[in-house]
Amino acid sequence: MDVCNFEIAKKLKDKGFNGKCVAQYYPSGSELVFNQTTFRGAIVEDCLYSHNSLPIECIGSVLIDAPTITQVLKWLREDKGLYVDISLCKKGYYAIVYETNFPDNKDYANSWNVDVLSDTYEQTALACIEYVLNNLI
């Protein structure tokens, strides 16, 4: 599961992301915790567990949601009208962001080449998400 890093998670919170996430960070960013009710897909206990499955005190809203890359890309598309196109070329993965705020979403008004070339799709997606958060919304 590819969750966003702590810095991106903080920026997403500041920009209004509020999707249901399977994991959260402590405010210090020191530990990623998983929500058992979401992670297992069934109501087990309404409590958070660390990576070693030891119960942690539930501290509620002070935790910072850690969405997956897929969740963030969907949020950018559906809520912000920004489509992220990640493609592979001979040198690695690159990204272009399209603005799609049209009723039919079949055309775009603007596009931005993100200055990133990475070895993996995930690295490129995270760099692109960070670019969008810092420059476009």
Language-model region placement:
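Structural motif
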Residues: 1-2, 117-120
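Short amphipathic alpha-helical segments that mediate assembly, nucleic-acid/protein binding
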Residues: 5, 69, 122-125
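Short intrinsically disordered terminal tails
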Residues: 1, 108, 129-137
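Extreme N-terminal leader/activation tails
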Residues: 1-34
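N-terminal segment of the canonical double-stranded RNA-binding domain
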Residues: 18, 37-118, 134
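A short, charged, amphipathic alpha-helix used as a generic interaction element across diverse proteins
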Residues: 120-132
